[in-house]
């Protein structure tokens, strides 16, 4: 009886060893990839990487896209390892590394940039007959300022504070799609975005209203914004990007970066970059959103 029992134990133990070291039982490296709120490009990046067939078929890496408030939340979660990878604006990476985030002296030194993704411009949407032609005309108005914790919100606060209007508007913290809906229902006079164009939320707003984009470039230039925050670049949102907006609109932009926690294995970072920045991978990303035409090995 003892011999039979001993033999059974040996068989069970051997089976456990086989299952533990069998090829199919090798644990996958789990990558939580932080995106952003609905209606924004950050989440399109995360989803696009997750659903790419070559990534889905990896035997030793599992990528899971996760929604978030946006850039600032992604910076913090990637730094503490709750997210292994994410999309963060370059300005927030720089401010975080140097302990200069607003009301946050912590230095976020565990976040490493691994690739440039695309330029993300500021966009301020108003109704064509609103009389709002400058940021300063927003005083007393109801404005969608982005999700709390997002890069859009942080950059809106930064710019509007610089322009002297942050404390003089009725602020509504909400995502882009919610803001577009509220704008269409006359619950907002304007809404701010910090995302690649064309934005689905602005397209939605233009379907129900005649819209204009405020010339943020002129405001930034005249106020010395570019000198105060040199990591922002100048650009024009081309005429025809949105229905009814028939002239180029000057603005400013930050760069969206693919970042990783410093403890993510080098081979995991390399493999995902290799797949996404391949000819097939870049074609897949452009299929998710035309903005990703900017992605290339040269950038």
Task: Describe the function of each predicted region.
Residues 9-20:
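Bacterial N-terminal signal peptides
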Residues 83-118, 196-200:
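Acidic, polar ligand-binding/catalytic clefts
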Residues 1-7:
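Positively charged n-region of N-terminal signal peptides that target proteins for export
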Residues 32-39, 65, 111, 142-147, ...:
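Second-shell loop/turn segments in exported
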Residues 31-34, 38-39, 49-76, 80-83, ...:
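N-terminal secretory/targeting leader peptides
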Residues 90-92, 100-102, 130, 165-264:
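Pocket-lining segment of extracytoplasmic ligand-binding domains
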Residues 28-56, 61-64, 116, 120-185:
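Bilobed "Venus flytrap"/periplasmic-binding protein-like clamshell domains
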Residues 247-299:
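Segments of small-molecule ligand-sensing domains
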């Amino acid at each position: 009886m003892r011999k039979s029992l001993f033999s059974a134990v040996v068989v069970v133990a051997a089976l456990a060893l086989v299952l533990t070291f069998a090829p199919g039982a090798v644990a996958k490296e789990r990558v939580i990839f932080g995106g952003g709120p609905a209606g924004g490009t950050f989440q399109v990046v995360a989803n696009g990487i997750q659903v790419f067939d070559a990534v889905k078929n990896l035997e030793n890496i599992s990528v899971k896209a996760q929604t978030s408030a946006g850039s600032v939340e992604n910076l913090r979660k990637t730094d503490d390892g709750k997210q292994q990878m994410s999309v963060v604006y370059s300005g927030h990476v720089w401010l975080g590394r140097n302990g200069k985030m607003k009301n946050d002296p912590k230095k976020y030194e565990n976040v490493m940039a691994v690739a440039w993704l695309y330029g993300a411009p500021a966009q301020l949407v108003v109704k064509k007959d609103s009389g709002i032609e400058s940021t300063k005309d927003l005083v007393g108005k109801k404005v969608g300022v982005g999700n709390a914790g997002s890069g859009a919100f942080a950059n809106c606060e930064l710019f509007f504070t610089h322009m002297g209007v942050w404390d003089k508007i009725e602020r509504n913290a909400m995502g882009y799609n919610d803001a577009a809906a509220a704008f269409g229902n006359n619950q907002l006079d304007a809404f701010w975005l910090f995302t690649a164009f064309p934005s689905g939320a602005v397209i939605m707003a233009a379907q129900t209203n005649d819209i204009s984009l405020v010339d943020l470039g002129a405001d930034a230039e005249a106020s010395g914004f570019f000198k105060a925050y040199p990591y922002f670049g100048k650009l024009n949102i081309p005429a025809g990007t949105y229905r009814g907006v028939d002239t180029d609109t000057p603005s400013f932009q930050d760069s969206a970066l693919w970042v990783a926690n410093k403890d993510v294995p080098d081979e995991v970072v390399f493999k995902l970059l290799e797949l996404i920045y391949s000819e097939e991978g870049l074609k897949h990303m452009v299929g998710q959103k035309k903005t990703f035409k900017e992605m290339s090995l040269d950038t």
